Amino acid sequence: MMKKLALYICVLMGMPSVFGQELQLPTGNQYLADSEFLIMPTYAGIGNNVRVRLSATSQWVGFKEAPDYQSLSGDMRLGNRSGLGLSLYNDRNGYTKQMGAKATFSHHLTLDSYDSHFVSFGISYLVNAFRIDIDKFTEAGRPRADAAVTDNRAMINHNFEVGVLYRYKGIFASLAATNILNKNKEMFDVKEPTTLRNYNLYAGYRYKRTPSSILEIEPSVFVQYREGDSRSLTDANVKFRWFDFEDYYWVGATARFVNDQAFKPLSVGPMLGLKKGVFYFAYGYNLNLNTIRSYNSGSHMITLGIDMFQGIGGCNCTER
């Protein structure tokens, strides 16, 4: 009921506050399931396989019309130094829905092969279809909140994403700008924000006591800044990965913060996963710590994957 009330308010305001959400996809923790390509175009083609990942997230379980998100992604090496990637997604949040895709090209350069010193560049083309189903705003026996709104609202957007990745031994740092093009002001209400750019930073360190150690510890941080409304968030993560030749399993934890509310986590949760042969599996749970926690039992994420067509490249700049 609270969610429906918020939607009615959006309708009464003429819809611009809802339309400001298009092309602003939810940032979940799917990237921690060895799926960095979802947030950084520069990771396309890093690895010795064609990597396919199917991921689904169900937020705020127990809350009616709660958001859910699904993605299917794949990336592969092209030649010895380049990569290609494709990601398809579906996002539903109450009575709004987004579907879209991104197609990515990346290129990887070696600065020093002996020290595993590399730099990568990536670019993605983005297409997004956004829709609001106003028919569901009306309850039995109640009129529509705004009689002037008589049809469903839908649009298609095109945009781009660019990024750079720096790697030195176990250190990695990647920066990307998403939705680099502004919207056409003539298509929207004067109050509609036209700047959709997001700036994403993903950095961390993979630590092994010795090169032959079976345990790897990976602390990392993800920061997102939205230029349009100056909002930003930070994920603080840690993963422990145990290797058994080419197989491995891992456990980890993540905490999300809104940056203007320091030291007050928005959500926390454990994660785990494994890679056995060509198959991959990961699961994550997030517990909300804000006021909505009383109305739901948390959020769940699951990732299934397969790594196909094993083949070692001719350049260690594409090794994971």
Regions found by a protein language model. Give the residues of each.
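Sec-dependent N-terminal signal peptides
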Residues: L5-G14
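Sec/Tat signal peptide C-region and signal peptidase I cleavage site
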Residues: M15-G20
